[in-house]
Regions:
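C-terminal reverse transcriptase regions that engage the nucleic-acid substrate
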Residues: 76-91
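Aspartic protease core domain of the pepsin/retropepsin superfamily
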Residues: 91-178
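Intrinsic disorder/low-complexity signal
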Residues: 3, 13, 18-19, 44, ...
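Compositionally biased regions
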Residues: 6, 28, 75, 153-156
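Intrinsically disordered, low-complexity interaction arms of viral/retroelements
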Residues: 1-38, 163-178
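Conserved acidic
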Residues: 21, 25, 44, 54, ...
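Generic recognition of well-structured, leucine-rich alpha-helical segments
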Residues: 59-60, 68, 79, 127, ...
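Aspartyl protease active-site motif detector
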Residues: 30-74, 108-110, 114-122
């Protein structure tokens, strides 16, 4: 009765605290949370079939690539990407990037779409890098070498694309595999 009367009153901008009331279900409207990554990070997304990112993400990564003198080039692509219940979004183009993954030179192909989407890489890229995530010790392993996880503000695991060999930009842990 208290909950019913509290929710049926006109808004008073007061805070009502509800504790220990069985069978109380409050649903919130669908909220959208934008994920903004620091430039140079790509999110590990096991549901992503192909690496993809929005135009703004590509512009940021290309500015950083230019500063570092690292190569990249575009190529034509004819693919569509769908996120949740939204409509399919056509790719504008694809990009080949020369990146540094945990101290190793690598390449990655990332589709560009005209949407506000962070960089996402999928299982194929992660498998190629022999990636293992360890949430217990907060590390990510690629090609047998560990480094600290770089989570997004939403706690999604991210990979830095600018950890080139012999850089001082990250803390790295070597792990001997026997």
């Amino acid at each position: 009765a208290y909950v019913d009367s509290a929710f049926n009153q006109p808004p008073t901008h007061e805070l009502f605290v509800v504790e220990d009331i069985p069978n109380l279900h409050i649903s919130f409207a669908n909220a959208t949370y934008m994920v903004n990554l620091r430039p140079g990070l790509i999110m590990a997304d096991t549901g992503c079939k192909k690496a993809v990112a929005g135009s703004e993400w590509h512009q940021e990564i290309q500015r950083k690539m230019d500063k570092k003198g690292k190569g990249y080039c575009s190529y034509p692509i004819h693919e569509y990407f769908k996120f949740g219940p939204g409509h399919p979004i056509p790719a504008v183009r694809g990009w080949n990037y020369n990146v540094g993954i945990n101290g190793f030179n690598e390449q990655i192909q990332i589709a560009e779409i005209d949407a506000d989407v962070p960089g996402l890489c999928g299982p194929d890229d992660m498998a190629r890098w022999k990636m293992k995530l360890d949430f217990e010790d907060g590390t990510i392993q690629t090609n047998g070498r560990k480094t600290l996880l770089q989570p997004s503000k939403t706690s999604h695991p991210c990979i830095c694309l600018f950890q080139f060999p012999k850089t001082e930009h990250y803390k790295m842990y070597d792990e001997h595999i026997t």
